[in-house]
Each structure stands twice: as structure tokens, then as C-alpha cells.
């Protein structure tokens, strides 16, 4: 009986609960000062055209806290860190399940690990 109940409960869970969400960042390991950094976030397990969905870019400089950079929402609303907004552009390609961040005029102070996240 316990096995049957577990199976029935599993079958009644909506399929979106069982899907695995993954996000993977790609881009150059290094850029030179004054160059433009272009990073791509390729994701699966959700659709950025679904109401309420959003993807953010964050970074973490060595030995420092996380810093939020930018966010794009399902309806193409865009939000940027006030201190970096003149250097950042975020865009999405829902057909490829990708979000792209570009950051102009790179500087050594921009040294960090860059992450995308569904937040």
C-alpha cells in the first residue's frame, strides 16, 4: 500500500515541479582593459516567455560579496545596477533560451566570477 500511495502522489505532481532548471554561463576567460565583455547564459527547465520568469546576472570579485548587475524579465523589462547602468546591456533570445550581458570599457576592478541566475 505504501508503494502505491507514493506512486500515486508522484503521478499527481505537475510536470513543471519535476523539471530540472539549469543555467550555464559562457564567455571569454579574460578581456583586456577598455574591451567589451560579452557573456551568454544558456538555460533549460523554464521559459523566459512565461509570465513571472526573470534572469539576472551577478558577479563576485575575489574575496568580496556578490554584486547584482542586471535583470531581464519575461516581458522584456530590464533593470540595471545604478553604478554600472551606463556600461551594461542585457538582452534575451527566447528561441535559443539565452540571455546575453555585455559590459563595455572593462577595467581591472571588474575582475570577478560572473554568474547568471533565475532571481
Swiss-Prot record:
Protein name: Immunoglobulin heavy variable 2-70D
Record SMART domains: IGv
Gene Ontology cellular-component terms listed: extracellular region; immunoglobulin complex; plasma membrane
Region (Framework-1): 20-44
Location of the region described as Framework-2 in the Swiss-Prot/TrEMBL record: 55-71
InterPro entries, sorted: Ig-like_dom (IPR007110), Ig-like_dom_sf (IPR036179), Ig-like_fold (IPR013783), Ig_V-set (IPR013106), IgHV (IPR050199)
Function as written in the Swiss-Prot or TrEMBL entry: V region of the variable domain of immunoglobulin heavy chains that participates in the antigen recognition. Immunoglobulins, also known as antibodies, are membrane-bound or secreted glycoproteins produced by B lymphocytes. In the recognition phase of humoral immunity, the membrane-bound immunoglobulins serve as receptors which, upon binding of a specific antigen, trigger the clonal expansion and differentiation of B lymphocytes into immunoglobulins-secreting plasma cells.
BP GO annotations: immunoglobulin mediated immune response
Metal-binding keyword on record: no
Region of interest (Complementarity-determining-2), residue spans: 72-78
Species of origin: Homo sapiens (Human)
PANTHER family xrefs: IMMUNOGLOBULIN HEAVY CHAIN
Disulfide bonds: 41-116
Positions bearing Pyrrolidone carboxylic acid: 20
Signal peptide positions on this chain: 1-19
Domain Ig-like: 20-119
Any Pfam family matching the protein: V-set
Gene: IGHV2-70D
UniProt GO molecular function: antigen binding
Lineage: Eukaryota, Metazoa, Chordata, Craniata, Vertebrata
